[in-house]
Regions:
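A short, N-terminal "cap"/entry segment at the start of jelly-roll beta-barrel domains
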Residues: 1-39
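Short, charged/polar surface micro-motifs in flexible loops or helix N-caps
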Residues: 34-37, 45-50, 68, 114
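Conserved short histidine dyad/triad with adjacent acidic residue
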Residues: 39-56, 90-91
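Short, conserved beta-strand element in jelly-roll/cupin
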Residues: 44-45, 55-71
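Short hydrophobic/aromatic-rich beta-strand segments that constitute the beta-sheet cores
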Residues: 52, 71, 106-108
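Short strand-coil-strand connectors
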Residues: 72-76, 101
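Short acidic-glycine-tyrosine-enriched beta hairpin
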Residues: 75-91
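Ligand-binding loop in jelly-roll beta-barrel domains
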Residues: 90-115
Length: 115
């Protein structure tokens, strides 16, 4: 078969080192290993210092699954809730801060691969 299925029971996020005061877990579910030109996965953000991601080399689309997240960029913030979709364009110097007061979980697709 040409498609690649990852059963829900096989998807487990793992901690990503994002600094001592931040906590973020994620897993790339589909990426180069499956021959994809993009990276797709699940990310969980926990309370703590905001997590910053640069978008110098990739763009992202994220679909909120659970909880709430706040995205901040250049002093502006946006709240994300379940069902919301956000597009973050690829742009040199673009830095987006992700944070939550409780918990937030989302599905992401980056193009090209973010790692």
């Amino acid at each position: 078969m040409e498609f690649h299925l990852v059963p829900a029971g096989e998807i487990e996020t793992e901690p990503l080192d994002v600094g001592p005061d931040s906590k973020l877990n994620l897993v790339d579910v589909i990426d180069r290993a499956q021959g994809a030109p993009f990276c797709a996965g699940i990310c969980e953000v926990f309370p703590g210092a905001p997590v910053d991601f640069d978008y110098d080399d990739d763009a992202a689309v994220c679909y909120m699954l659970e909880g709430e997240l706040t995205l901040a960029e250049d002093g502006e913030t946006r709240a994300l809730r379940p069902g919301d979709v956000v597009y973050v364009p690829r742009r040199k110097g673009l830095l987006v801060y992700w944070s939550t007061d409780s918990y937030g979980k989302f599905f992401y697709v980056t193009y090209p691969h973010w790692r």
